[in-house]
A protein has these predicted regions:
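Hydrophobic pocket/interface hotspot
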Residues: 27, 37, 61-63, 86, ...
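Hydrophobic ligand-binding cavity/cleft-lining segments
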Residues: 1-48
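Short beta-edge strand/loop motif at the mouth of beta-sheet-based domains
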Residues: 15, 35-81
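Intrinsic-disorder/low-complexity, polar/charged segments enriched in Ser/Thr/Lys/Arg/Asp/Glu/Gln
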Residues: 11-17, 60, 81, 94, ...
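Hydrophobic/aromatic beta-strand elements that line small-molecule binding cavities or substrate pockets
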Residues: 18, 50-53, 82-88, 114-122
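Short, highly charged C-terminal tails/helix-capping segments
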Residues: 165-170
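Beta-strand/loop substructures that line and gate deep hydrophobic ligand-binding cavities in soluble
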Residues: 98-100, 106-152
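A short, structured loop/turn motif at beta-sheet edges
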Residues: 24, 53-58, 87-94, 120-129
């Protein structure tokens, strides 16, 4: 099992860190391919029925998460669309992209905050330290996503990532 997630706010950035018991190249790969992302992206009780990835600078990642857990009350049946536009990719080491809330056509939802995400993949002798830095345009935008439960959602998502990494290494 990997380590616990560490989260903190630094100015307008939400910083998340966690060590995964998997090699860096594998952790990087499961962030770069739709077939992998469909298996683990999103909090528990949510699936990814739609996901496309054009993994290159200027390329787009477009996905839909759907709540399939009846125990999640008003969220059951809800769809949440997202879109990322990749800016910089250093193979095995770094992904920088802008993350948007979107509709099914990939149009940005104007009244929801976007964020510039920098993901760093650090080799730790067969394990990988993943550091995600999400920079928001304002304190209000950051507070909006914190109030939406972003930290819990990412914790559950990264728990699912750990489980997926374990399954593909067997």
């Amino acid at each position: 099992m990997s380590g616990k997630m560490i989260s903190r706010v630094e100015g307008l950035e939400l910083v998340l860190e966690r060590v995964f018991d998997a090699p860096r190249d594998l952790v990087f790969k499961v962030f770069s391919e739709a077939e992998h992302l469909k298996q683990w992206w999103g909090p528990r009780g949510w699936t990814v029925p739609f996901c496309t990835v054009d993994f290159r600078p200027g390329g787009v990642w477009h996905y839909c998460m759907k709540c399939v857990d009846e125990n999640q009350g008003e969220f059951f049946g809800m769809e949440s669309w997202g879109k990322g536009i990749y800016h910089e990719i250093i193979d095995g080491k770094q992904i920088i992209y802008t993350d948007y809330f979107s509709d099914a056509e990939g149009n940005e939802i104007a009244d929801m905050p976007s964020t510039l995400v920098t993901m760093l993949f650090e080799d730790q002798g067969g394990k990988t330290k993943l550091v995600s830095r999400s920079k928001y345009t304002s304190a209000e935008a950051l507070q909006t996503v914190l109030d939406m439960g972003m930290e819990q959602g990412i914790t559950e998502t990264w728990d699912r990532l750990e489980e997926h990494l374990e399954s593909v290494q067997q």
